[in-house]
Curated annotation (Swiss-Prot):
InterPro entries: Ribosomal_bL33, Ribosomal_bL33_CS, Ribosomal_bL33_sf, Ribosomal_zn-bd. One of its GO terms (biological process) is translation. Coiled coil: none annotated. The lineage of its organism: Bacteria, Bacillati, Bacillota, Bacilli, Lactobacillales. GO terms for molecular function: structural constituent of ribosome. This is Large ribosomal subunit protein bL33A. The gene is rpmG1. One of its GO terms (cellular component) is ribosome. Belongs to the bacterial ribosomal protein bL33 family. The keyword Ribosomal protein applies. Keywords: Ribonucleoprotein, Ribosomal protein.
Amino acid sequence: MADNIILECTECGDRSYLSKKNKRKHPERLTLKKYCPVERQVTLHRETK
């Protein structure tokens, strides 16, 4: 069962992306490189609690 997760920019703290993840198969936090509209560059985004 996939749950919705929110991705937060590690640079500015903006939460601009939603994604889905199966928390039973992958219990660790997800980190992805995504475009941050506030920073106007690609930054590291981490899954929030």
